[in-house]
Design a protein with these regions (language model features):
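Short, compositionally biased leader-like segments
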Residues: 21-29
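A general structural signal for short secondary-structure boundary/capping elements
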Residues: 25, 37, 80-85, 100
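Short aromatic-glycine-(Arg/Gly/Cys) micro-motifs in beta-strand/loop hairpins
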Residues: 28-62
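A short, charged, amphipathic alpha-helix used as a generic interaction element across diverse proteins
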Residues: 60-64, 69-84
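Charge-dense polyanion-binding interfaces
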Residues: 85-104
């Protein structure tokens, strides 16, 4: 499981380092939503962290862009990423914005 270098963290998340450790161990957590990037569809998606319990995600771990305390907060984080993308690049291509440093 990989985490984005500038991980987006929602305001309701009290201890992101502890949550990261627990996610790496596939611990069952309540009220933790993940903003993920999957290479296959080149989109950001919101999942409850319990989705990681499925075998598919153990073989194909997602790239985690952000952690939120609710689905609504995760959507707000995606909106914030979109606003940053438009202000810095003039485009709403979130994936290109998030990974532009890695391509340079």
């Amino acid at each position: 499981m990989k985490f984005y270098k500038n991980l987006y963290v929602g305001d309701t998340i009290k201890n992101p380092a502890k949550i990261r450790r627990k996610l790496k161990k596939y611990a069952k957590l309540n009220n933790v939503y993940l903003i993920t990037y999957m290479e296959e569809n080149r989109q950001l998606e919101i999942y409850h962290c319990l989705m990681l319990q499925q075998y598919y995600y153990k073989d194909n771990p997602p790239y985690i862009i952000g952690i939120a305390g609710s689905q609504e907060e995760a959507a707000q984080i995606i909106c914030r990423i979109a606003e940053e993308s438009v202000s810095k690049t003039g485009k709403a291509d979130l994936v290109e914005y998030l990974f532009m440093d890695e391509r340079s």
